[in-house]
Every structure is written in structure tokens, then in C-alpha cells.
Amino acid sequence: MKRWILCALALAGASQLSAQTKTPADYVDPFIGASTSAEAAGVLHGLGKTFPGAATPFGLVQLSPNTITGGDNGPGYSYEMKYIEGFAFTQMSGIGWYGDLGNFLVTPTTGPLHVVAGRHKELPGYRSLYSKKDEVAQAGYYATTLTNYNIHAEMTTAPHSGIMRFTFPQNKQSRIQIDLARRVGGTSTEQYIKVVNDHTIAGWMKCPPEGGGWGNGAGKANYTVYFFAEFSKPFKNYGAWMADIPEGISRKSESVTSLKYDSLVAKAKIVSKFTELQGKHLGFFTDFETKDKEVVLLKSGISFSSMEGARLNLTTEIPGWDFMDVRAKAKAMWNKSLSEISIAGGTEDQKKVFYTALYHTMIDPRATADVDGTYMGGDMKAHHTNKFVKRSVFSGWDVFRSQFPLQSIINPNIVSDMINSLVELADQSGNGYLERWEFLNAYSGCMVGNPAVPVIADAYVKGIRNYDEQKAYKYARNSVEKFGNIPKRKAMDISSTLEYGFDEWCQSQLAKWMGHPEDVSLYAERAQTYKKIWDPEKGWFRPKKADGSWEPWPKTGRLQQNYGSVESNPYQQGWFVPHDIDGLAELMGGRDKMIADLNSFFEKTPDNFNWNDYYNQANEPVHLVPFMFNRLGTPWLTQKWVRKICANAYKTGVEGLVGNEDVGQMSAWYVLAASGLHQATPGDPRYELFSPTFNRVAIRAGATGKVFTIIAKNNSPVNVYIQSATLNGKPYDKCYIDHQQILAGGTLEYVMGPQPNKKWGI
């Protein structure tokens, strides 16, 4: 941690550039995607669902405004909403299914004390209208004005802690209040608070499934948030509110925002000048008189391990009260991380989209270990390690496609950390298999497939092996045996069968590389199970019943949403055979027929790429599809369609993402695609090559420190086709490159043109 402080100080000094020079962090706009609007998206899933608040790269703390508590509002914030309830120290990014976190909600107020947010006209509350004119979101910084109170609120973060600066008006009854029960999508069911001294509090908030959250409790989220908070203004008149919540009252989702529930909280007992309190619904407040424009600060360390961990996190990272210093360090950290990829050319808006996308890929997987390496394990006990950083929020079904392949190039340590975290979780929890959607040690079981298996296979083949290989293999094998194309699985839907088949191919590859010859053919054979649900009469994949008969074919055919397909239709899901594209082509009647159908799939897609029945960039099942043209011998079609997707599906503004950010996946796809390279098959170190959005892209490989540069001469929105290429000065006629070639550094140079060169890359 001392190294972090020294590094941040050095970076802060180095980033003092002229006002005319923009750094990568200056291009970041955290408002991009910060909408949950189902109306704008045209589908219930909504848009990006990102949060606009302050964070550091892969940090534990995200300090952000919260506009609503209940409903399917994962980030806690939506740009369209008019009120802010407060500012929380933890958030999820880009997820649906009700979300979670949003803990330790801080709200500066004036006037009479209110203990509910004020969602119901019958019960006045502490929430406030806020000024859009004053709202600022930058990498590592957020600010707005709460207009009901005329309080200007600013916040910034270190990796495990955050600091807030409030500028108050003249008022004899100013206040900072903290709702300790608050939780996105539910509530904390039990809290503890201790007054340490006249300016410090510490405590915890338990968040079990009974309190809702992640999937309204179905995701089994069960964690405790610990805090250690200091105030710049000593306590004089302080206290707590303590609501009596009867047994049997639902504490999930919309229940905790109902008038019935808020009425219970509104009757809370006020406890003055206490030392310690524990209860089912607690909040803390400190009242004080302020002069006009008086500044009061609050800072807190957060931990998922202990109160001592929270204290250590705060005192290590933010020992003083210099808000601007913490802000400068946060920006410096972002500049260092974002500089792993540099771009030239393109418009200012395209640069903003690119660096914001790269920023969003660096929110998760977040650290959950304290500064000393202590973390909460899968056995609900504290553990300590210096071998890796415990990480969480593994949205596997999404992120194996682009997010982890991207990080394998620029941040291989993050990939290694996540694999270690999943393997240790399988070990400590006693579950013995790798979770597909992990959240703070919870086995959520969300989505389908065994996505941790391709993440491990992709890492291993790329030389990322800083974990217990045999444990990783064992738990990967257990995963495909528990959830896979196994004999006892009779009914066969499309999504699971195809996803499991790919995972089993990855397991076969791992068996080959890790010395398990007896498993190679077993899983290679199971990887071919996808052929069993191909209906030659319909010419497409079709789900089967448990007795082996076909499910009835719908009137809309392969366009029928959710017909054997998860968050997709068979037309979208059916392309997912990345491990055997030639085999898929054979089923379809040959390459020419497959290419024609695939091109038609794109031709019928709406230009804005919003949720639709064809190429649906708004959701993950199709994310590897554009790169299949390279594998089919028509690389100019990959060039054409990738450029169009990048131009039309990714924009500036709160509606800039056509679908949920999904913990970095939506943005990682863009970062790789706009850079001109993306895998068609994770687990195969081959990257497909195509035309980049920018004239120059320089990628620093995290494993070697060497820079791989892609240059596109004559590049423009019209000149999207590669005419010729050289690699390190020598002619290059392949439409792909190996991971090791990227790590070695070098220069790949294209000449671009307005018409396809159908001889290049064949």
C-alpha cells in the first residue's frame, strides 16, 4: 500500500500538464450509459445501467449518487430521475436482476430530521431534488447540488475508502445523516454502530438474502459491510434513529419502499448521545450549525472483512483531510490504467466513447480484500494472502466473451486474481465447482453455462498461470460434470446445450494442456452435443423435450424470443458454436449458405442496434458472431459490420449504450473491436483482425511491457476495408494474429480503402 501512495503521488505530479493537453482520464464521461430507461431501450432490460460516481481502477469503493432504492435498478442511479436519496460507498455497474450494494448511504441535510427517504407524499423525507446544471461526473470525482438544502456535494475515492466534501448554507440546523439499513433492491436486516470518539463512528451492516438485493434474494447474496468513518466537524448533537421492524415483515425489493414499510420506519425511536447500538433498522445523524459556504467533510474506509479492516483501509489511504489530494491521486490512477491503450485519429466523441468504455472495463472485477490482503472467504471466515488480490463480481456468462480476453492483454494480473478467487471460493465454500455468476462469495446460479471454464482455458493458453493449476482443473472438471451435456440431462434447450458444448471443448483443451489425456476425448466428444439439437427439417437448432422429441415449432420460427433460448431467440443463440465453426457450416449446408444467412442476419438488423430479433448488440449471445466471417473466408464482412456496430451502437450521452453494461462486457467488446482485434473463440489464442475505428492504436501488453501498434492509413468512415497489411515492415496477408505476437510488441500497418479487397486475409 505504501507503493500505491508513492506511485499515486508520482503520477499526480506527472499529470500536471498544460490546460490544452487532454489526458485519457479527461475523455472519460461516467454519464455514458447511466440510464435505466426501459422506454428508451425499447425493452424491459433497459440501457447501460452504469453509475456516474467516483471510483478507482478495480477498487473496492464506488462513491455514487443514489436516486432510488427499490425495483430493478442495479446501479442505484438513473439520470432520468429527479431526486437523490443520498450517496453510497458501494455500487454495482451495469447489471439487471434488482442489483445490490448501495450501502452506507450518506445524505447532507438541513432543517427537521427525517428518517425515511420521502418516496410517499404522506411521509416527508430526506431525499432532495438536485441540480443537473451543477452535476459533474469525471474519472474519480462526482459533484452536484442538493437544491432542497442548497448543499453542494462532492466526492472522490481511494481504492478502499472515500471522502466527501459538503458546502453548506448558513443554517442553525445543518446535518449529515447516514442510513445504515439502506441497500439497493432491498435492505440490510441488522446493523451495529459504535461512537468511537467525538468525530468517529464504526460499525457494520448485514445483508443476507432475506433482505432482498441481488435477484431479490434469489441470488443468495450474503455479506456484511464494515465501515470506519470520520467527520471533520466534532459531534455535539448526535444520535440515531432505531425502527422496530416486526417479525414476518417482508424486507425485499418493493416491500421496503412501500408506504407500509416506510410508515414503520417513520415511527423510529430517536436515541441521543449513545455509545453503541444494534438493531434491525438504524441510522446515524450529527447536527451542527453552519456559516454560509462552510465546508464539512466525511471520510470512511469500507471493508467486507472487519471494522478493523475498514479502519486500516481509511488510515492507510486517506490519513488527512486534503480532498483535492485524494482527487488528484484518483485521476492519476485512472490516467495510468487508461494509458495501457493509446489512440490517435477519430473524432473527439469517438475518443470519449473509447476511453469511457475502457474506464467501464476497469470497475470490475473489484478488490474485496483489505489493504493488508485480508478478505472474507467462501467459508464466511477471514483469510489473508499476499499471493493474489481477492476479487468479486464475476458476471461469467457475459465477461468470458470480451472482458477477460481484453484484460488478458493489458491486465493479466486481474485475470489471475479472478481465477484464484473463484478457485479458492470453490475450495473454501465446500461447493467444489466454479460459480458462473459470483457476487461477494455467493453462488448465484445466474444465467447458463460454465463460463469460468473458458476464462481459465483462455488464460492458460496465453501463459497466465499464477494459480493452483491442478485445483483449477479439478474444479473446472467438477463444473462441467455438475452442469453440462451429461447423460442424465434429458431435456435439451438451445442456450444450455450450445454453451455447455463450448465449455466442454475448453475443458478438453485444458485436459490436453494440463496432462489429463483420459479427459481429452471425453470432453471433445461432448463438445459435439450441439449437433443433437439441429433439426435438418427446419434447418436450425431446436429444443428437445426430456423424451427426446422436439418442442413444438413456433409460428415465428427461429425468431421466437425465449424459445429454448436465454434472453435471445434461436436465430441469435444458434450461431454460438465458436469451437467448431466448420462443423456448424456443414450442418447449414456449407460455407456459402452459412455466409449468406449470416450476412442476412446483419442486413435485417436496425441501424441503431437497439434490442431486436437479429444481430442484438444489446445482449451477449451474439457478441462473437461478427468475427465468424473471418473464419469463413470473408474477412471484408467482419470489417464492414464491426465498423458499423462501433459507429452506431456506441454513443456519447446517458443513452450511449444500447444494452446493460454487464460488468464491463459491453464496453470491452467496443474497446477490442474499435482497436481492430477480437477473439472469435476464447480458449484459442487467435485474435481476428479487422479495420480499427482509429488511425492508430497502441496497446501495452501487461505481461511484457511491450507495445503492439496498429496503424490504419487512409482510414475514414468510408474507407473501412483493408487493402493490404504489413507486420513489422513485412507483407502480412493473414486476417488473424496470435496472442504471443501481441505480447512481443511490433507494428501492424494497414492501407485502407472504400471497397473490399477480397484477396486479402483469405
Where are these regions (language model features)?
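Conserved catalytic core of nucleotide polymerization and phosphodiester-bond processing enzymes
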Residues: 712
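Accessory carbohydrate-recognition regions in carbohydrate-active enzymes
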Residues: 20-404, 408-498, 511-532, 538, ...
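Extracellular attachment/recognition segments
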Residues: 721
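ATP-dependent phospho-/nucleotidyl transfer catalytic cores
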Residues: 503
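Bacterial Sec-dependent N-terminal signal peptides
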Residues: 1-21
